[in-house]
């Protein structure tokens, strides 16, 4: 489409008008290159080898798939090439310093939804870009122990029927689609806006017996539909791939819930704050949606370590608010989590790219 916004054009304009974001733009451009390679591997399926083969054990004890290792290597190479200062990955036990004069730190989940590799369901790459905060002799984890409000940019690539990028630089959320002919990422539509109301929710309902009371009560109300207190019917959507559910919510609304529960290893939630919850929350808030752990806005949580877990609820603001109210009724107060999306960087025409 001749009138579609090209990602490279968008990044050039942001970098020229807001030099403080130049390093972040370089990272996104480099990650787009890695995403093209990952998309090509996935498109070939078994012709690329047994990408779903278990080749080892991940940090959390799950089986590490072949594609987990491949995507980690590709993304790491891209981040190094971008000139970033530090790199952290779900597939690495500890972060690492890269470039001593780099300006940003990049945290990634190289392959979200790896259980879907062999099923043609969507998988993705999630990233968060933070100020590097150099300090002599500092622990390479230090740049990543900032709240999500400090993110300079964030996004995810999703590999499904098509490859797409959802990205924000703090002034709205844009969705770019990879053109397989030209190799360019193009944005043919306006910035994403998540409707406040919805009738769709995403949660793994098989774990109902393990949930905290506020989540259980909220989901029971939805399941009662028009016969319950809500008076309307809801539909369940669950892809076992957070990027897939997030992409759908950015397009038409909905609420996603991955709460803490009573199972061993799930007491503090399952998703990682730094490189999963924070970037998704940033994207959602910049599209007019909300994200919380049930009590506190995700972007206000202070990480204590790089692989810290947290509960995560995000999506249409009206429904996220209801979850917070459920915690309040249960005597587990939540903090204010609904604020207008920030346009604090929109001092130039950059705002028009995302508005």
UniProtKB/Swiss-Prot annotation:
Its EC number is 3.1.3.11. The keyword Metal-binding applies. Binds 2 magnesium ions per subunit. Its cofactor is Mg(2+). It comes from the Bacteria. It is found in: Cytoplasm. It catalyses: beta-D-fructose 1,6-bisphosphate + H2O = beta-D-fructose 6-phosphate + phosphate. Belongs to the FBPase class 1 family. This is Fructose-1,6-bisphosphatase class 1. It comes from Acidiphilium cryptum (strain JF-5).
